[in-house]
Amino acid sequence: MTVKLTIDCMGGDHGPSVTVPAAVNFVRSHPDAELLLVGIESAIRAQLKKLKAQDLPALTVVPASEIVAMDDPVEVALRKKKDSSMRVALNRVKEGEAQACVSAGNTGALMAVSRYVLKTLSGIERPAIASALPNPNGYTMMLDLGANVDCEPQHLLQFAEMGHALVSALEGKDRPTIGLLNIGEEVIKGNDTIKRAGELLRASTLNFHGNVEGNDIFKGTVDVIVCDGFVGNVALKTSEGLAQMLSNIIKEEFGRSWLTKVMAVLALPVLMRFKKRVDHRQYNGAALLGLRGLVIKSHGSADAYGFEWAIKRGYDAVKNGVLERLARAMEENAGSLEQAARDASGAGQASPIAGQPAEPYAAQSSKA
């Protein structure tokens, strides 16, 4: 099976200087992958020439005349830049010419344009950003990580359904455990939204573990952790900052004297394994779930190594049939999700119209 992905080469802080080398490295190690490199043709070809990769048959350059800048408002990306590398890459997925799109572009713009071009799956009101965070036994899937700052209880239930389908597809688990991120394990804790979401999850057919706390994220307590995008994005950035700080402290301490430098040489194998386990670049690439196409969001600041991992996330998602499994799961649970929405509306909680852009998109950090 050939996996064909589109790469938004102009997205992110570094553009083609990062995205093109990552794409070249990826196809050289994955012979069953084909990548469509979308963006300013001259800039892409200059990088390919630099890498001596002009003739790689697995790479195809797709011209696009505009770039969505990292600080562009959503409205500009959506209404004015219709020939942007982001828009063209997503259109190729919509038209069936590729199976997934990978972009390091402006988060708010990517979510809004993806939603406009690809539309949402039946039963999904708001797509969510999901990514894997390391734990001692592998990883914990967490969502939402920044797409929806404010959520209603039924949205958190939808996120749980999508997280369940994603982990089932990637890990082969029939009933992955679901946790709801809260300030305590007790059902009486949390705000009204969290309490109501907990009730919906307990009444669902999901394997709901219950409330989990921030320290459970890296323990591997559950397979999937659900939260709103504000909390999720803060947790993600905090973990990345902590990992970087620990690496810097260790490097500084081992460089203090000749004795510590000798100790560093002796401990090098252990240090290298530690660095690899906490290197957030290996976890780069978050899936935009709930759309009628696969979209992978890379960090805007990612280097070539990190962006290559984002490409791998898209590749793995296609190979494991994530989109098909997600669509099937949403269809099977459509009744319970609709009932949850009606219950929430009956309790006086506003529910946005399905298919309409959610307000939080415009407020997203461009590098989330």
Curated annotation (Swiss-Prot):
EC number(s) on file: 2.3.1.274
InterPro entries (UniProt xref): FA_synthesis, Phospholipid_synth_PlsX-like
GO molecular function: phosphate:acyl-[acyl carrier protein] acyltransferase activity
GO biological process terms on file: fatty acid biosynthetic process; phospholipid biosynthetic process
One Pfam family named in its UniProt record: FA_synthesis
Chemical reaction(s) catalysed: a fatty acyl-[ACP] + phosphate = an acyl phosphate + holo-[ACP]
Compartments where found: Cytoplasm
Main location: cytoplasm
Region (Disordered): 337-368
Pathway: Lipid metabolism; phospholipid metabolism
Record's subunit section: Homodimer. Probably interacts with PlsY.
Family listed: Belongs to the PlsX family.
Function statement: Catalyzes the reversible formation of acyl-phosphate (acyl-PO(4)) from acyl-[acyl-carrier-protein] (acyl-ACP). This enzyme utilizes acyl-ACP as fatty acyl donor, but not acyl-CoA.
Protein name: Phosphate acyltransferase
Organism: Paraburkholderia phytofirmans (strain DSM 17436 / LMG 22146 / PsJN) (Burkholderia phytofirmans)
Gene field: plsX
